[in-house]
């Protein structure tokens, strides 16, 4: 029997009613067909490392946001509801997203101040 691999995109589609409700709670509307197109094509073509299957990596989401929120004719205001909803899933994940979150980055240690030697 064939098994399908669950990806961040397929996961959001499997829970589409919850994704739409989350967007609605943020005051925006998202459409399934556009969600798929943005994830599989538009964001991939931005050449910022977005994978076709989607990701809950905040680094990748931030890179896409930089393109979407770019000023003037370079931005993509029509995509704002989609990337903000995607970020919301990554930063405040429902139980079905948690197993797909990337592992947290180890904290970077800051240099410790040296006490003066007598």
From Swiss-Prot:
Protein name: Core protein p15
Biased composition, class Pro residues, residue ranges: 100-118
Lipidation (N-myristoyl glycine): 2
Gene: gag
Stored PANTHER family: GAG_P30 DOMAIN-CONTAINING PROTEIN
Organism: Feline sarcoma virus (strain Gardner-Rasheed)
Region (Disordered): 97-118
Post-translational modification: Specific enzymatic cleavages in vivo yield mature proteins.
InterPro entries in alphabetical order: G_retro_matrix (IPR000840), G_retro_matrix_sf (IPR036946), Retroviral_Gag-Pol_poly (IPR050462), Retrovr_matrix (IPR010999)
Superkingdom of the organism of origin: Viruses
Location, primary (coarse class): virion
């Amino acid at each position: 029997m064939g098994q399908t691999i669950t990806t961040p995109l397929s996961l959001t589609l499997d829970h589409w009613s919850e994704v739409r409700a989350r967007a609605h709670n943020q005051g925006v509307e998202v459409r399934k067909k556009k969600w798929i197109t943005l994830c599989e094509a538009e964001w991939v073509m931005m050449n910022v490392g977005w994978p076709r299957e989607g990701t809950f990596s905040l680094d990748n989401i931030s890179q896409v946001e930089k393109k979407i929120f770019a000023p003037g004719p370079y931005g993509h205001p029509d995509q704002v509801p989609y990337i903000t909803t995607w970020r919301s899933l990554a930063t405040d994940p429902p139980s079905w997203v948690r197993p797909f979150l990337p592992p947290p980055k180890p904290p970077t240690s800051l240099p410790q101040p040296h006490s003066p030697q007598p």
